[in-house]
Amino acid sequence: RGLGDVYKRQVLMEMKNRSKMQDPAEVYTVDMRKELKNGNRSILSEQLQRLMKERLEKKEQTMLFLNRRGYSGFVSCRECGHVIKCPHCDVSLSVHRDGKMRCHYCGYEQTRVKICPECGSDHIGEFRAGTQQIEEIVKTVFPQARVLRMDMDTTRQKDSHEKILSAFANEEADVLVGTQMIVKGHDFPNVTLVGILAADMSLYTDDYRSGERTFQLLTQAVGRAGRGDKKGEAVIQTYSPDHYAIATSAAQDYEAFYEEEIRYRTMMGYPPAENLLAVFISSADEALLETGCRYLKEYMIKAKKDIEASVIGPASPGIEKINDVYRKVIYVKTADYHDLVVLKDRTEKYIEINSGFDKMRIQFDFNPM
């Protein structure tokens, strides 16, 4: 059940016990800032390496989940965990090819930072490790381990997805490395350890729903450990151990997460506490798109004269160009959903009577999920 559904109905249906009444996995949170200070520069923490070694000795299996969902090139400090955020929207800034850091909500931009403004460290940058690199690291640290990798590259061929899962289920591998596709609904009775690498990756995306999505992914991942008769353990590796999405997922506490997340959404004016209208504008002509966005925003500001609303942007919606078509987005925030509908209707009429928008595609999305 999504956070918005719970908010609207004020009803929470909880399933606190597993289907076969197994004990929940024991969850350990590892602060990767301390790992760095202790001289460990590996993506595998000392605790995770020790637990993986135990599994290999017991002939039990391990799943390593690299949390890259929604990854958008955010910049963080490995010394203190500080993430460079937009000063106006409380979402992370994304690094673009021109070296600038931009907010995909309001369009704010700044030059890329090389020194952490919080602690002064030069250990600041983008997270670059992928599943292939993780696989190589595991093989180096544990030469005796049989390792399978499951990601977009290894599942392109027909039936490859099923073959990898079948091989792991048949215990033809000791370790399965993968992205979010390995954590959803799979039951492997011999998996007693799950390692969640870079739990922060989905937490600091340029999306106000990043906390909710992180909580969902981490709780799903933790739930893969100990599905059989053996006790399960999970290790969450993070640079932000005190963030509520990390702490509550480690505790498997949805109620505590919900309370913190709703507080954040209310403070920032994001759904479901308030309503959001996303206006997506696209065109093959970049200059025309820029001009159209400017006129459209100016009109929307005038059109909301009797409506209590904020018009934000235009900004880049994550991916700026798809199939040679350029994209922008304008956001409108207001407490009253009906006001959004009124403003949307007025804007549509304005677009219809202005031929300058004929070579642009304009879409409206209420409270985008």
For each predicted feature, which ranges?
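Conserved beta/loop motifs at nucleotide-recognition and modification sites
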Residues: 64, 302, 307, 355, ...
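Short beta-strand elements
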Residues: 148, 303-317, 358-365
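Short amphipathic alpha-helices in soluble, non-transmembrane regions
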Residues: 292-298, 342-350
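Inter-lobe coupling/hinge segments of SF2-like helicase ATPases
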Residues: 1, 5-290, 302, 318-320, ...
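Generic C-terminus detector
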Residues: 337, 345, 349-369
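Short, low-order "capping/linker" segments at domain edges
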Residues: 320-333, 366-369
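Short helix-terminating capping/connector loops at secondary-structure junctions
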Residues: 58, 229-230, 306-307, 355-359
